[in-house]
Amino acid sequence: DAIFGEEYGAKSGTSGLTWVLDPIDGTRGFVSGTPTWGVLIAVGDDAGPQIGVIDQPYIGERFIGTPQGANFIGPHGEGAIQTREQRPLHEATVFTTFPEVGSPTERAGFEAVAEKAQLTRYGMDCYAYALLAAGHVDLVIEASLNSYDIQGPIGLIHGAGGIVTDWQGGPAHNGGRALAAANPEIHAEALAILREFP
């Protein structure tokens, strides 16, 4: 297997599979002592991740997504998880890491979605994606991502029944802009807005 990661660079393999690793996603959260950071692991091929893990070792929570489904393991038990059921954007909870999101255009795109949502939250790093997979959040919108920032969350969210694309509806596993959604309906609603910000 090949390996690619923030700390490791790229090491080639022969199986067609690549492990994508980010040992501390959310460095600012880690440094400040907030449990919003995590370890990201993905296994996939050129088409994208098939398995995704978000692990928060400080509070002992692990979220695992595979093509067969998604599971949570934590100090109070374990079990299957899935994304939220359909709700309109005006009832949605939207997360991003930084209020400035990315470029001025990307910030405007995020704000165009956020102003239509019921609740907007900032500063959750990779833990926002875990909350989406577990059914607590409707949308996570980010920009300026590296592939190792998003591949673990993609595998997890797909396993939990959600969708992750770029802001034009294409694949997001190579990094850049990401729109993670709990279900196809709210994804379509947010995507229709974000497509206006190329």
Predicted regions and their residues:
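N-terminal subdomain of lithium-sensitive/metallo-dependent phosphomonoesterases centered on the IMPase/IPPase/PAP
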Residues: 1-24, 163, 185-198
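Conserved residues at the C-terminal ends of beta-strands
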Residues: 6, 55, 143
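Acidic active-site catalytic centers that drive phospho-/nucleotidyl reactions
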Residues: 6-7, 22-25, 29, 138, ...
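DPxDG-like acidic metal-binding loop motif
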Residues: 13-71, 92
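A generic "binding-loop/recognition-motif" signal
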Residues: 35-37, 58-59, 68, 77, ...
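Short helix-loop capping/hinge motifs at secondary-structure junctions, enriched
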Residues: 48, 69-72, 76-78, 101-103, ...
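Short amphipathic beta-strand/extended segments with alternating polar/hydrophobic composition
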Residues: 55, 65-66, 78-87
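An extended, acidic
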Residues: 82-198
